[in-house]
Amino acid sequence: MKKIMILATLGLLMTSFRFQADTDAIVNAFKAADAQEIGRYFDDFVDVKLLDKDEVKSMGRNQATLALKAFFAENGVKGFEKVSERELGNTMYLAGKLLTKGKSNNITVMLRMKDGRKQIITLRIS
């Protein structure tokens, strides 16, 4: 019984480090303004709201990646500052400031656990 508890605890710890690694990779991709890397963490369908544009529900992964890449190019994104991170069950919220030419925009990312990793299901830049 003791061995089972130890193995279960180790398994839980290892998966929690994996989940934190996903979050760190997403934050680093935003800091580098790397839409392709961010796109790797998109779910199959993503709700996307970009600055001064209507929200698009259930945008496909590839289309969302292209839209984000175009946004980064148009706005000269230079970096990202994480403001907060909250986790509720298997859903996580990540908020921060996207640094562009001369100003910063608020960004909110909602992620959920799917297939053993965090995937972005909502992306809002305002």
Task: Describe each PLM feature range.
Residues 24, 36, 81-90, 126:
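Exposed acidic/polar residues on beta-strands and adjacent loops within beta-sheet cores, strongest
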Residues 35-45:
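Short, well-ordered alpha-helical segments enriched in acidic and aromatic residues
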Residues 3-28, 32, 40:
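Short, low-complexity N-terminal intrinsically disordered segments enriched in polar/charged residues
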Residues 104-126:
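Short beta-strand edge/turn micro-motifs at domain boundaries
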Residues 22, 26, 34-37, 60, ...:
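Stable alpha-helical elements in mature extracytoplasmic
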Residues 48-57:
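A short gly/proline-enriched turn/hairpin at secondary-structure junctions
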Residues 46, 90-92, 118-119:
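Hydrophobic residues embedded in beta-strands of well-ordered beta-sheets
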Residues 62-104:
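Surface-exposed, charged secondary-structure patches
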